[in-house]
Design a protein with these regions (language model features):
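Non-catalytic, surface beta->alpha helical segment in thiol-disulfide oxidoreductase systems
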Residues: 84-115
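Typically the conserved alpha-helix immediately C-terminal to a functionally engaged Cys/Sec
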Residues: 40-53
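The canonical Cys-X-X-Cys-His
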Residues: 36-39, 82
Length: 115
């Protein structure tokens, strides 16, 4: 008798991204890893952005060491890569490498002082 195939659970990162894209808020998703120096340098920038834009945008960080399956559907080739989604869920920008906080805020559709 053949063994039953193990049921694969969906990627938690993909589910998080999908949920955020359905909220009507702009979203940044960074695909990175704790083993990546630039990714580690981005951590405080993304944390500050999340705090500044709390309730107005989603900031999601996917650690590909923990959830590699999340990279596939987005064709991630470099770490870090940031993907920006408009409030309607459409992908509007993709950026490989590090980014400054003012640029992240601008890409999300806000001015630097979040007017």
């Amino acid at each position: 008798m053949a063994a039953c195939a193990e049921k694969l659970s969906p990627s938690p990162g993909l589910q998080l991204i999908e949920n955020a894209r359905q909220t009507g808020l702009p979203t940044i998703v960074e695909f990175g890893a704790t083993s990546c120096t630039t990714c580690r340098n981005m951590k405080p920038i993304l944390e500050a952005t999340a705090l500044e834009l709390q309730g107005r945008a989603h900031v999601i960080v996917i650690d590909l060491n923990q959830d590699y399956a999340a990279a596939g559907p987005f064709n991630i080739r470099m770490m870090p890569t940031q993907i920006f989604f408009a409030a309607d869920g459409r992908e509007i920008e993709r950026h490989p490498g590090g980014m400054a906080q003012p640029e992240i805020v601008r890409q999300l559709g806000f001015t630097e002082d979040c007017d």
